[in-house]
UniProtKB/Swiss-Prot annotation:
Keywords: Cytoplasm, DNA damage, DNA repair, DNA replication, DNA-binding, DNA-directed DNA polymerase, Magnesium, Metal-binding, Mutator protein, Nucleotidyltransferase, Transferase. GO terms for molecular function: damaged DNA binding; DNA-directed DNA polymerase activity; magnesium ion binding. Gene3D superfamilies: 3.30.70.270, 3.40.1170.60, 5' to 3' exonuclease, C-terminal subdomain, DNA polymerase, Y-family, little finger domain. It comes from Colwellia psychrerythraea (strain 34H / ATCC BAA-681). Poorly processive, error-prone DNA polymerase involved in untargeted mutagenesis. Copies undamaged DNA at stalled replication forks, which arise in vivo from mismatched or misaligned primer ends. These misaligned primers can be extended by PolIV. Exhibits no 3'-5' exonuclease (proofreading) activity. May be involved in translesional synthesis, in conjunction with the beta clamp from PolIII. The active site is at E106. It is found in: Cytoplasm. It catalyses: DNA(n) + a 2'-deoxyribonucleoside 5'-triphosphate = DNA(n+1) + diphosphate. This is DNA polymerase IV. Binds 2 magnesium ions per subunit. The record marks Y16 as: Substrate discrimination. It is an enzyme of class 2 (transferase). Belongs to the DNA polymerase type-Y family.
Length: 352
């Protein structure tokens, strides 16, 4: 995309419902919604089977049941959704620090200066979606474009579990055919008002002028005019830099010796280096090893460190494993802690 920005919009597919279907296989092939089932309750979301009956988010549960009598409604598990969202955010951070979360299930990523995947935003989006599926057994859709507006529109083009790329040379053609219904900020009433004046697609707006649009939609006219030309100059609103980096693996079978744990750490260390690459300007201040035992209790041993040292992880493992009390190990993890701001004079050192 040359000097253009490379923005990815990731949108999880029916996030809450997908988690319920993942955790409870009996829900996988039935119409499912998450929300309350009382007479005044509304739905948070629904799966694609339910959507075929017209069931939608924010719909009263009683209406949803009328549309789909065999709809299964389950109460949400917000703690699980938040933890899963945190895991997804960790996957994003492997590729860029420039992340703007919009909700638990969607975010913008700026990968303009990313070096992974040869700097290809398309490949990065594919890798992120693959990581989410392989590690969390959930699917996500993605839009890749030169700005936030187009990336968000694009992420909806090939849902579910797909992605759409709008390169700079395709922007004009893509936007020209775009229905005004798809522009954020245009609800049914505004669209109806525009429609009455002959505006149906962005092409219609492009042939008009801001003054004429102001007479119809007021202050929104300028934004509408720019978006109809594919222009959106907003930067990502990055809330804060990550304070740590972690990688862990839940083992297929519990292991029962320190040497077996060391082999796992050797493997995790190489993956940690890969994930560390996008954060090479951050100053490391801490290393840690985490073990979770057969009984699901866990322990973490940390120490101060200004570089990522494999030998130090092995030393920390020895201390952590001494707390096992003959319990098997089911999870092994490595952590790095960062200083609050990037070190200006100190370059990150990687001891291989």
């Amino acid at each position: 995309m040359g000097n253009q920005k490379k923005i990815i919009h990731i949108d999880m597919d029916c996030f809450y419902a997908a988690i319920e279907m993942r955790d409870f296989p009996e829900y996988q092939n039935i119409p499912l919604a998450v929300g309350g089932d009382g007479p005044r309750s509304v739905l948070c979301t629904s799966n694609y089977q339910a959507r075929q009956f017209g069931v939608r988010s924010a719909m009263p549960a009683i209406k949803a049941k009328q549309l789909c009598p065999h709809l299964k409604i389950v109460h949400g598990r917000m703690d699980v959704y938040k933890e899963t969202s945190k895991n997804i955010r960790e996957i994003f951070s492997r590729y860029t620090d420039l992340i703007e979360p919009l909700s638990l299930d969607e975010a913008y990523l700026d990968v303009t200066d990313a070096t992974m995947c040869q700097g290809s935003a398309t490949l990065i989006a594919e890798r992120i979606r693959a990581d989410i599926f392989n590690e969390l057994n959930l699917t996500a859709s993605a839009g890749i474009a030169p700005n936030k507006f187009l990336a968000k529109i694009a992420s909806d083009e090939n849902k579910p579990n797909g992605q759409c790329v709008i390169t700079p040379d395709k922007v004009a053609n893509f936007v020209e055919q775009l229905s005004l219904k798809k522009i954020p900020g245009i609800g049914p009433k505004t669209f109806e008002k525009l429609n009455r004046h002959g505006y149906v697609t962005c092409a219609d707006v492009r042939q008009s002028n801001i003054r004429a649009l102001q007479n119809i939609v007021g202050k929104f006219a300028n934004s509408l005019y720019l978006k109809s030309h594919g222009v959106d100059n907003r930067d990502l609103e990055v809330s804060r830099q990550r304070k740590s980096l972690a990688i862990e693996t839940t083992l297929a079978h519990d292991i029962s010796t320190q040497d077996e744990c060391k082999l796992v750490i050797d493997s995790l260390y190489q993956k940690l280096l890969t994930r560390l690459a996008p954060h090479s300007n951050r100053e490391i201040i801490r290393q840690g090893v985490k073990l979770k035992f057969t009984d699901f209790n866990q322990t973490t041993v940390e120490t101060q460190s200004n570089e990522c040292q494999q030998a130090l992880f092995i030393s920390l493992l020895s201390k952590a494993y001494s707390r096992s009390n003959k319990r098997g190990v089911r999870l092994v993890g490595l952590t790095l802690g960062f200083a609050d701001s990037p070190g200006e004079s100190q370059q990150l050192s990687l001891s291989l």
